[in-house]
């Protein structure tokens, strides 16, 4: 019996050439709507779906393949005598190939002016039903949903006259991944439209961006996936201009650096190691900002990741070229800067839109046996809600330093302490199990620069010991959430040493 293929695609990439190959193999082709029209315009002889179903396409194409003559031909088990007898009795012919991809729901809801009605109209019904039927019966039916697989199928047909069983299984698995992702997009869109923040089930879909050499360590396998509607201001959507392939750790560090540099509107440069900032500087231009970020910690920056929120110019590139760096991320690089930096074969250069999100996206954290979901911490300092409990208020310069330190501290692993002075960080204490321990690290790193600096803490002081350490180092201003039952003890110490202290009322733990 002559083999038959059913072709109905939204993405028409390569479909004419593929169908031509099927016809050359003696395979009969059934098609629908726009696909049929395209194939016929290219001189290919195909059979209309209505000739198979004996029923016209109705309801603006909503009902065309939902018919026993189609699904019987897809689902019949060819070595089951009962199935074969029923097919013969009802005049149903088998369908051996299904080439279908679905209505462009993702592309539709990505449009800024999309209406709810437009979105609903682009929910495919017949397509998923067909490919699921074919995939279930993949022992007898080859189903292709991705144009990238056209060449594989044609090559096997030309070589063997049929598609290998292993290939059919792989194609079937791809179908169910495809429909699962498609349904997840629809589910998430409708959930969002209804304003449901914590649905009883959560289905997420990500698209593979690249395989990675390994994970956090060489013995761990890893892959990088991107969210279908992630902000373009993200590592997932960055363009790599030069250098080696990104590693797992590179991606994590680049993400951390990008998150911090987005906090600043003035020219800023951030240096990151192991997802913590080691130096942050701001200035009148990007060269000055980099100089300050470098001077913040010239030891730790070695082998680090740099993020800038302005174009990298030649003079800045020449300074960057002097040290070993893994990655430089910026909105753009001047032609001259690229010429300088591309001399380093392995240095990764990424361009990305630097734009702080105004709405909190969801952050997913995997735990053993489950998943934690929370909003990203995008909250900025609100000066209208702060309080100053100390006798002395911060000076203009202290305010400037406090704001810089506060922007940075929320991106440092808790317990977090950041010292800032003269438009740069001068000490970072990260990830200690007690707050005073982080303060001591930051103060030690700052050395003599701590005199007259500002300190930011991501959470309140449970005891005044951190204040005591700050006072001994000559720190003159502190910003912290407040809210401890011992706040009065900290306020008394601050007043004793003439330290100005600001309470924000907002905690910024990061784990």
Swiss-Prot record:
HAMAP family: PurH. SUPFAM superfamilies: Cytidine deaminase-like (SSF53927), Methylglyoxal synthase-like (SSF52335). It catalyses: (6R)-10-formyltetrahydrofolate + 5-amino-1-(5-phospho-beta-D-ribosyl)imidazole-4-carboxamide = 5-formamido-1-(5-phospho-D-ribosyl)imidazole-4-carboxamide + (6S)-5,6,7,8-tetrahydrofolate; IMP + H2O = 5-formamido-1-(5-phospho-D-ribosyl)imidazole-4-carboxamide. This is Bifunctional purine biosynthesis protein PurH. InterPro entries: AICAR_Tfase_dup_dom_sf, Cytidine_deaminase-like, MGS-like_dom, MGS-like_dom_sf, PurH-like. Belongs to the PurH family. One of its GO terms (biological process) is 'de novo' IMP biosynthetic process. Signal peptide: none annotated. One of its GO terms (molecular function) is phosphoribosylaminoimidazolecarboxamide formyltransferase activity. Pathway: Purine metabolism; IMP biosynthesis via de novo pathway; 5-formamido-1-(5-phospho-D-ribosyl)imidazole-4-carboxamide from 5-amino-1-(5-phospho-D-ribosyl)imidazole-4-carboxamide (10-formyl THF route): step 1/1; Purine metabolism; IMP biosynthesis via de novo pathway; IMP from 5-formamido-1-(5-phospho-D-ribosyl)imidazole-4-carboxamide: step 1/1. Pfam families: AICARFT_IMPCHas, MGS.
